[in-house]
Every structure is written in C-alpha cells, then in structure tokens.
C-alpha cells in the first residue's frame, strides 16, 4: 500500500510539474494593450474625429500618439479624449513647427496631456551626410533643451535614411553620439530601421533607454531595403506576417525600458490588419 501511495504521489508531482511548466510557457510576451498612432486612421480622422476615437476605443486602445490635430484645437481634442477615458501620451509635429513654433508646440502638447513631442521627418535631408547629421544633432540639442525646460521630452523618430553607413557604424550612430541624452530621446520605428538594413533588436540592446517610444509595424515579405525613407503603403502588413522578428524586438524593448508602443499601419487595409495585429500581440508568449 505504501509503495502504491508513493507511486500515486510521484504521478501527482510529475503532473503538477508539467502543469506548472505549461503555465510558465504561457506567460504573455506582450501583456499590455498597445497605443495607436493617429496616422493609422488619418483618412477617418479627417472625416470624423469623435467617431474615429470611438472606433479606436472599441478596440480596447486608450493610448494615442497624435501626428495632427485634425482641425481641432488642442483643448477640443483633449476634451474628446477625456470623455472616452483616453490619453495622448505623445504629440507629433513637423520639423518646421518644432524649430519655428516651439512654444506653441509645447503649449499644445501640455494641453493634450502629452509627455513626449515627436518629429518623424527631416526636410531637405537629401543626401543625408555627416555634415547634415551633425547640424541636425545640434538643432535637436537646442530644441530638446527648450522642451525639457517645459517638462516635455523630445523624441526623434527614425525614417530609414539615417542608416547610411559611416565609419564602423551609420549616421544614425552619429545622431545618437552627438545628442545629449538628457534632452534628446528617440522613437524606434522598427520598419524604418529594418528596411535600410539595421537590426531593431540590436539597436535596442545598444542604446537602451535612449529609446522611449516605439512604432510597431511589419514589412511585406520580399520587399528589398534601401535608404530612401519611403516604401509603398501597401508594404505595411499585419504584425507577424512580414519580415520582422517581433518576439526578439519586443524582448529587447522590454529590457531597454521602452515606455509606449504604438501601432502604426499606413496601409489601406487597417480594418482587417489592425485587429489581426492586436490578436498577434496577444498570442505571443515567452
């Protein structure tokens, strides 16, 4: 009888160990709900701001990065967000406005409740040279300091052309090296890092907390890279169906301390691709 009890206990312990192992394996890799970049629904926002916010809220998303006020004042947009229990954590502006309307940009960001002010495109950047990178870094430092003094964090969003080779690295490395970490942070757009040949996970490991924000995107299979900073919008595909190694990127992002993740899908297929992307993120496990 004792031997039989020992055998039963052994089976119970073995079963429990398998169950525990299954639970550990089922731990979600990406537990939070991501935010949304307004550009994903740019056409809808042009027609109906309140209705588009309702549509995004219905997906379970409450964190927004706005790249446009869509005809609203910052106060009006903040009211619409508050009514829906939503927030704007990052406010995207043009580089021209950042340079020439810095105080207005800062005021709008504060009204919106945003902590971050983001720029995603540099005008007159062709060709992207060492001299241009150094000039841009100096401007970033100056503007970043002004925003920092107003309680905001400036972030630059890479767009591909910065990864032109230079020395043992790229001109993106020059931007990192020549900017002050206390005044200039970065938003990693993983598609626009991958397309010119960089490895997003390795960038996160290398620069860590310099990356405060991330755009979650995937690139259609078969698309070849370049340094143009441009690709057809149809090349944005649902996460997990393209070229990028999302699990490796998300693990590296967690280690780096990325604070906000935003879905950005520039394609005309957001009605199907955004839900597919959300389902993919939920399916990931460690």
Regions found by a protein language model. Name each.
Residues 1-9:
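Positively charged n-region of N-terminal signal peptides that target proteins for export
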Residues 2, 25-116, 285-286:
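N-terminal pre-domain/capping segments
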Residues 39-41, 67-69, 93-96, 122-124, ...:
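Active-site beta-loop-alpha junctions enriched in small/polar residues
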Residues 76-83, 139-147, 248:
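Catalytic-core regions built around general acid/base machinery
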Residues 62-63, 70, 95-185, 271:
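Active-site acidic/histidine proton-transfer and metal-coordination neighborhood
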Residues 27-35, 45-59, 113, 169-188, ...:
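Histidine-acidic metal/acid-base catalytic patches
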Residues 10-22:
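Bacterial N-terminal signal peptides
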């Amino acid at each position: 009888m004792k031997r039989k009890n020992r055998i039963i206990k052994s089976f119970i312990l073995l079963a429990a160990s398998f169950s525990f192992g299954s639970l550990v394996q089922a731990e979600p890799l990406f537990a939070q709900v991501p935010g949304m970049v307004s550009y994903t629904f740019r056409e809808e926002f042009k027609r109906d701001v309140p209705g588009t916010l309702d549509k995004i809220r219905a997906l379970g998303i409450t964190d927004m990065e706005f790249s446009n006020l869509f005809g609203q004042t910052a106060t009006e947009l903040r009211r619409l967000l508050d009514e829906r229990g939503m927030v704007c954590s990052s406010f995207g502006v043009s580089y021209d406005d950042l340079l020439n309307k810095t105080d207005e940009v800062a005021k709008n960001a504060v009204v919106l409740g945003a902590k971050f002010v983001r720029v995603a495109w540099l005008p007159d950047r062709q060709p992207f040279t060492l001299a241009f990178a150094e000039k841009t870094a100096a401007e970033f430092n100056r503007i970043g300091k002004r925003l920092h003094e107003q309680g905001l964090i400036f972030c630059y969003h890479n767009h591909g052309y910065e990864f032109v080779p230079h020395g043992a690295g790229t001109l993106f490395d020059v931007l990192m090296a020549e900017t002050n970490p206390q005044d200039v942070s970065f938003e990693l757009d993983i598609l626009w890092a991958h397309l010119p040949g960089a490895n997003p996970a390795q960038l996160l490991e290398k620069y860590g907390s310099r990356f405060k924000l991330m755009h979650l995107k995937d690139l259609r299979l078969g698309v070849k890279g370049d340094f143009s900073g441009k690709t057809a919008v149809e090349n944005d595909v649902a996460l997990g169906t393209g070229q990028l190694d999302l699990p490796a990127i998300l693990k590296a992002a967690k280690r780096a301390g990325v604070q906000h993740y935003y879905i950005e899908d520039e394609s005309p297929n957001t009605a199907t691709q955004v839900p597919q992307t959300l389902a993919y993120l939920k399916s990931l496990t460690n």
